[in-house]
Structure formats: C-alpha cells, structure tokens
C-alpha cells in the first residue's frame, strides 16, 4: 500500500505557492496580474 502523497505543511505551502515567491519573478508577477484581472478573491496562498 503506497502512502498518501499530500502531506500538508503550511511552511512548504507558502514557500512554494506564496505571494512573496510570486512577486519574486516576472512570470510570478504575470500570474498575479492575470488573477487580479480575472477578479480572483485570493491571489496567492
């Protein structure tokens, strides 16, 4: 029996999908701007 792959961890969650990480790269800022344009309630984790 294999183990479940999703092992929740808030620190890793923010390091991988967080707002600061998105702001760091040009591609990440593009993600945020497209989510703003779409009107997402939450932009990043």
Curated annotation (Swiss-Prot):
InterPro entries linked: Ribosomal_bL34, Ribosomal_bL34_CS
Gene: rpmH
Keywords annotated in UniProt: Ribonucleoprotein, Ribosomal protein
GO BP terms in the entry: translation
Source lineage: Bacteria, Bacillati, Actinomycetota, Actinomycetes, Propionibacteriales
The family this protein is said to belong to: Belongs to the bacterial ribosomal protein bL34 family.
One term under GO cellular component: ribosome
The protein's name in its UniProt record: Large ribosomal subunit protein bL34
Gene Ontology molecular function: any one: structural constituent of ribosome
């Amino acid at each position: 029996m294999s183990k479940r792959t999703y092992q929740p961890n808030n620190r890793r969650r923010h390091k991988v999908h967080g707002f600061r990480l998105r702001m760091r790269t040009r591609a990440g800022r593009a993600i945020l701007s497209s989510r703003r344009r779409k009107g997402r309630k939450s932009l990043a984790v």
